[in-house]
Amino acid sequence: YQKTLIETGHPKRGDIVVFKYPEDPKLDYIKRAVGLPGDKVTYDPVSKELTIQPGCSSGQACENALPVTYSNVEPSDFVQTFSRRNGGEATSGFFEVPKNETKENGIRLSERKETLGDVTHRILTVPIAQDQVGMYYQQPGQQLATWIVPPGQYFMMGDNRDNSADSRYWGFVPEANLVGRATAIWMSFDKQEGEWPTGVRLSRIGGIH
């Protein structure tokens, strides 16, 4: 992906943010800030849709939900391939393929628009993929797949939803880890050096980072 860093203050909901990965601060990640401090974030792994309720500090009733809307699901221009190398290591790659063509061992990704309040962006999903919800970060006192963002922290998600290791799996990003805002995230995904564009290792959470 291409990214242009912009000086960051407090990210707004929907901003694309570059930050130090909390579990390994040597790594920079780029994700979208979907949850701000005090937000209650719920993700439905079946419909792959978000519910966001602002102003839900612990122990406080929160009834108002942020308007979150989705366009119809459509085929995207991208195909994701899956294969195994000698020795059984699973790899994956992304290719731009005309909609009237197919690719061996490939699955065409779906695309739709997600609107968080007044911010609209495109997201990608893999039609056959389901999150391993049991690997989600479970916040103490909250149901699985529901998180209340603590003060001074943020809930980040990738737009390439089924190929993103993000706050669903490892929790919140402290404000101190923020590096800057960015202008592009489309088709980015977490990777190890040297593994793009030939493929990426399947992560321990069962998706592609």
Per-segment meaning from a language model:
Residues 1-209:
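Soluble "head" domains of membrane/secretory-pathway proteins
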